[in-house]
Amino acid sequence: MKLHELKPAEGSRKTRNRVGRGIGSGNGKTAGKGHKGQNARSGGGVRPGFEGGQMPLFQRLPKRGFTNINRKEFAVVNLDKLNSFAEGTEVTPELLLETGVISKLKSGVKILGDGKLEKKLTVKANKFSASAKQAIEAAGGTAEVI
């Protein structure tokens, strides 16, 4: 067998249905659109969410909540990610960004307590969860809020 003889497995690829190409094709003349009406016209059809004049679902349901314009979004780092650093390292947001642990600084860095920290580190971040702070100090390191 040569490269030009390769063919996809039987039934793995369906041929495109070419509509409006003669009566014999089974999809000629009206091209599967039926006779006249809004959906038979070019650009025909209704917009998404339109229910024929009935009050649409999204308008029948109440509004909920709001978007806080002052919200802060933190880059999240779990404890198990900090094990990649050498013992005694001072872990800063800049170092985390440099090493690819986080992709963006956002509004700062928050350290969360998922996983187990096995090294003594000095961690500097904008926020710490209670469990993360406890785990860092239990490993002999320090958690410093910047």
UniProtKB/Swiss-Prot annotation:
GO BP terms in the entry: translation
Cellular component terms per the entry's GO annotation: cytosolic large ribosomal subunit
Signal peptide (UniProt feature, chain positions): none
Gly residues: bias regions: 21-31, 42-52
InterPro entries per record: Ribosomal_uL15, Ribosomal_uL15/eL18, Ribosomal_uL15/eL18_sf, Ribosomal_uL15_bac-type, Ribosomal_uL15_CS
UniProt cross-references to HAMAP family, sorted A to Z: Ribosomal_uL15
Subunit record text: Part of the 50S ribosomal subunit.
Primary role: Binds to the 23S rRNA.
Protein name: Large ribosomal subunit protein uL15
Organism placement in taxonomy: Bacteria, Bacillati, Bacillota, Bacilli, Bacillales
